[in-house]
Amino acid sequence: MTTLHSTPRADGFHMPAEWAPQTQTWMIWPERPDNWRLGGKPAQAAHVAVAKAIARFEPVTVAVSAGQYENARARLDVPNIRVVEMSSDDAWVRDTGPTFVINRSGEVRGVNWDFNAWGGFDGGLYSPWNRDSQIGGKILEIERAPRYCTEGFVLEGGSIHVDGEGTLITTEECLLNSNRNPHLDRAQIEAVLSANLAVDKIIWLPDGLFNDETDGHVDNFCCYVRPGEVLLAWTDDPQDPNYARCHAAMNVLQSSTDAQGRSFTVHKMPIPGPLYATEAECAGVDPVDGTQERNPTVRLAGSYVNFLIVNGGIIAPSFDDPLDSQAKAILQDLFPQHEVVMVPGRELLLGGGNIHCLTQQQPAPHKN
């Protein structure tokens, strides 16, 4: 594997928007019994549904442990899904995988961020995380893609969204959290993002969704629809703890312009629920010291914003909620050239995330 010691911006590379053409989507097979109930079996079924939905539109590669390889290979039984053996600590490839960058000469490289399980020993979700910290490099090696390393800089892919035209959206709750990069201030963090993603302007939303155990990842709260347009999780209920968060984000977006000088058009996506795990669902998770516990009294951070854009498709979660049909209609209206496919997302939510968190798109080479 080639490790580069420059930066993507210096070499003419940038992170493309999610709607740019893709060669494939990466996923990791869930099996961790102290995070996924019943040994991960319900989550694996949900994972299969997501992978097969994506495979209708583009190839999928699923990384799986040696112990689960035979099971995963048998269940992911469609030609467009590749299964590769790879050790991991959990399934969140959005956060553990590389961020792919491209240039205008048809090359694809990757940024290999540091990973500390969403906070390390200061609020992190599990320990150890050494196998997860190797995921980015392993994926890039399989793809023979040169990598840029950001040793000493912790970042999860779910904490950023870009428009491919110089603007990045994130949250202060996550990127300025003392359990990520306490040695860096806002300006220094912006400099790292600028150098590695070739962005020129960063929009800082104050917080993400209430009770998001990643410390407020933006991909569960606000995402780009196209340059200059975003989709924001929303509630009109003043009693909902998300109310202040949504309105604070709206204020920032309405008072900001992007790197191209455009004002933002903000579309609203209703928040489902409130959703909670049942006592039985929580009882199915193995209790282990140092791992995030599952509690039926704690509201789940369910969100329709946690969807994935693929070639010609939108893969979005449903929650058996009355708002499911409205969410699908909103997405179809915003993406008229894509087919919106809703996949049951409750089992994924019970593990702490959803479809966008569990996937990582690999952009296709761009050639002028």
Curated annotation (Swiss-Prot):
Protein name as it appears in the record: Agmatine deiminase
Catalytic function, reaction form: agmatine + H2O = N-carbamoylputrescine + NH4(+)
Domain of life where this protein originates: Bacteria
Biological source species: Pseudomonas fluorescens (strain SBW25)
Enzyme class: hydrolase
Keyword Cell wall biogenesis/degradation among UniProt keywords: no
Gene Ontology BP, a term: putrescine biosynthetic process from arginine
Gene3D superfamilies: L-arginine/glycine Amidinotransferase, Chain A (3.75.10.10)
PANTHER family given in the database record: AGMATINE DEIMINASE-RELATED (PTHR31377:SF0)
Annotated active site: 357 (amidino-cysteine intermediate)
HAMAP family: Agmatine_deimin
Keywords from the named record: Hydrolase, Polyamine biosynthesis
Family: Belongs to the agmatine deiminase family.
Role: Mediates the hydrolysis of agmatine into N-carbamoylputrescine in the arginine decarboxylase (ADC) pathway of putrescine biosynthesis, a basic polyamine.
UniProt-listed Enzyme Commission number(s): 3.5.3.12
Record has Ligase as a keyword: no
Gene Ontology molecular function terms on file: agmatine deiminase activity; protein-arginine deiminase activity
Quaternary structure and partners: Homodimer.
